[in-house]
């Protein structure tokens, strides 16, 4: 068998993106980041929490400076759009 072909096994801290808690585990990877852990996952806690992230539309509106007031367009009603028929000229 060849010597020194196996990766180094070490203890690293797994960090949770939601709550920030760190858990030590043994692995060959240098660092691990996870979205949720047993400390903040709804299955283990019984409490539902929300992580607010901006979606693509929010990022677009922020980039181009569009506010909530500018998003609402007021269209004229149908009564305003109807014009009286033009009189026929003889």
Curated annotation (Swiss-Prot):
Residue ranges with Basic and acidic residues bias: 81-90
GO terms under biological process: translation
Highest taxon of source: Bacteria
One Gene Ontology term, aspect cellular component: ribosome
Stretches the record annotates as Disordered: 71-90
Entry keyword set: Ribonucleoprotein, Ribosomal protein, RNA-binding, rRNA-binding
Subunit structure: Part of the 50S ribosomal subunit.
Family classification: Belongs to the bacterial ribosomal protein bL31 family. Type A subfamily.
Classification via PANTHER family: 50S RIBOSOMAL PROTEIN L31, CHLOROPLASTIC, LARGE RIBOSOMAL SUBUNIT PROTEIN BL31C
Name of the protein in its database record: Large ribosomal subunit protein bL31
Lineage: Bacteria, Bacillati, Mycoplasmatota, Mollicutes, Acholeplasmatales
């Amino acid at each position: 068998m060849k010597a020194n072909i196996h990766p180094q096994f070490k203890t690293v801290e797994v960090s949770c993106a939601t709550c920030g808690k760190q858990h030590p585990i043994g692995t060959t990877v240098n660092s691990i980041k996870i979205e949720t852990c047993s400390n903040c996952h709804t299955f283990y806690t019984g409490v539902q929490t929300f992580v607010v992230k901006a979606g693509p539309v929010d990022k677009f509106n922020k980039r181009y400076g569009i506010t909530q007031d500018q998003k609402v367009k007021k269209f004229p009603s149908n009564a305003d759009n109807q014009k009286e028929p033009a009189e026929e000229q003889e």
